[in-house]
Amino acid sequence: MPCIQAQYGTPAPSPGPRDHLASDPLTPELSKPTMDLASPEAAPTAPTALPSFSTFMDGYTGEFDTFLYQLPGTAQPCSSASSSASSTSSSSATSPASASFKFEDFQVYGCYPGPLSGPLDETLSSSGSDYYGSPCSAPSPSTPSFQPPQLSPWDGSFGPFSPSQTYEGLRAWTEQLPKASGHPQPPAFFSFSPPTGPSPSLAQSPLKLFPSQATCQLGERESYSISTAFPGLAPTSPHLDGPGMLDAPVPSAKARSGAPSGSEGRCAVCGDNASCQHYGVRTCEGCKGFFKRTVQKNAKYICLANKDCPVDKRRRNRCQFCRFQKCLAVGMVKEVVRTDSLKGRRGRLPSKPKQPPDASPANLLTSLVRAHLDSGPSTAKLDYSKFQELVLPHFGKEDAGDVQQFYDLLSGSLEVIRKWAEKIPGFAELSPGDQDLLLESAFLELFILRLAYRSKPAEGKLIFCSGLVLHRLQCARGFGDWIDSILAFSRSLHGLVVDVPAFACLSALVLITDRHGLQEPRRVEELQNRIASCLKEHVSAVAGEPQPASCLSRLLGKLPELRTLCTQGLQRIFYLKLEDLVPPPPIVDKIFMDTLPF
């Protein structure tokens, strides 16, 4: 009789107090799993000499030692079971004396309490290992004259097994199943996987059946996983006797692969269906188009409520303001939206914008004011260390110290004015040659204008760009009569009560103006018109309707006075060069030579 033997086995257990359970009658519907492979021709049980589990697993003290299968056949010596389960079944089938057998004739010795013959029509393959794509583990060589013990299917190696309430419900369910009819179906074999890791013992945790896998607990540290081909037996509730047992669907491949579910396919703005991300956030096509149109048209919305309107699939079109604010709140990026000039040019940006970002008058005025404040000394940082109010007048000629002080004040102011000019919007976009030409041509005018605006002519105080404060008498010998003209201009400028924004625009107009030798005069003219428009709007807003034109004309009338004072300053530098007491700095000498009107 051919036999199939598990890889490890021990002698059959001796009769004991559990023998009376072996005659427990079983129902024909297989309420308990039975796979009886014994036949009337089976030889008497013979002991085996195979090693037990305790030989291979340290600390194992359980009684689960054998897993036996037996098929009826002719009286032949036990064949070696070194091949896989599929090859063993085929060899048994080709035996000349083998006959067809029924599934009821199978018997499994081990822990597998569950119906096996009812839903055989759901078997997906002839072998459970073929279904899961893993080969069966090869059993160990057989032992001659080994016979399986005649035990009850529910009398396992762990002692008497009393079904739990769950399996009592399973018994009631299996009794209602129709009996199998028709031709006998070949059984599905099992695939034994090696121990995977520690797990609680069978006595501590009940046996659980999963959709396609049943786990037999062998001990506190060992377990075997038995793959089955009955996915239709997957429980749909914590109890196996639930009403949906037979109708439990086989999980689809998408569900088994962990496909995204829940809110991952919902629009982050309104909750509608969303297939992919738009502008950095998963949104629906409606919210994507709404956000795109709003950004491209630079639309401005107004909420008629309290700016907290609900935005969902049904009410998303009620308040455009709240919908756009929610688009921004969930993380949609406005900079990603292509403008009208970029339509059809996916992935490409213009090399240089046609218009600087600070094109609006409000932004331009803010930038001019910020540049002016950053370039001037604060009141708290004024330097009075050299200030002397009582100074005896010197009627003689100037000495070298006075001339050196004059040159130092000019060169120090030039660096401050250069940094201020670089912060004017649009000035950095000009060519380097035009930038240098505008700075050198307007330097003396800017020096006079800024000094006159900061100084206090009533007190005779002159406040320079570095924060140094000097009295008028301290500058008389170095500046000559030019200092008196500067103070007179300062008094007239203060009489106009010019605020900081208007003065910032006026200073920029002194720098950005037409000069002889410009490479790009058109760009300079465009920038000048923008600054003039900004100044006009500011004066109109501050002065009011009755007299905006007169205020603007009086303010612009100071520009010709600056040209006259600039010529007077060039004459003073020319006079000091002739005296040759101190050589002028190279930058001052260059400015003097380039600015001469002749």
Curated annotation (Swiss-Prot):
CC annotations in GO: chromatin; cytosol; mitochondrion; nucleus; transcription regulator complex
Compositionally biased region (Low complexity): 37-50, 134-145
Residues found modified as Phosphoserine: S341, S351
Subcellular localization: Cytoplasm, Cytosol; Nucleus; Mitochondrion
Region (Required for binding NBRE-containing DNA): 268-354
Region (Disordered): 1-50, 120-159, 341-361
DNA-binding region(s), residue ranges: 264-339
Processing and modification events after translation: Phosphorylated at Ser-351 by RPS6KA1 and RPS6KA3 in response to mitogenic or stress stimuli.
Gene3D superfamilies recorded: Erythroid Transcription Factor GATA-1, subunit A (3.30.50.10), Retinoid X Receptor (1.10.565.10)
Family label: Belongs to the nuclear hormone receptor family. NR4 subfamily.
Subunit structure: Binds the NGFI-B response element (NBRE) as a monomer. Binds the Nur response element (NurRE), consisting of two inverse NBRE-related octanucleotide repeats separated by 6 base-pairs, as a dimer. Interacts (via N-terminus) with NLRP3 (via LRR repeat domain); the interaction is direct, requires binding of NR4A1/Nur77 to NBRE-containing dsDNA and lipopolysaccharide, and leads to non-canonical NLRP3 inflammasome activation. Interacts with GADD45GIP1. Interacts with STK11.
Protein's UniProt name: Nuclear receptor subfamily 4 group A member 1
Gene responsible for this protein: NR4A1
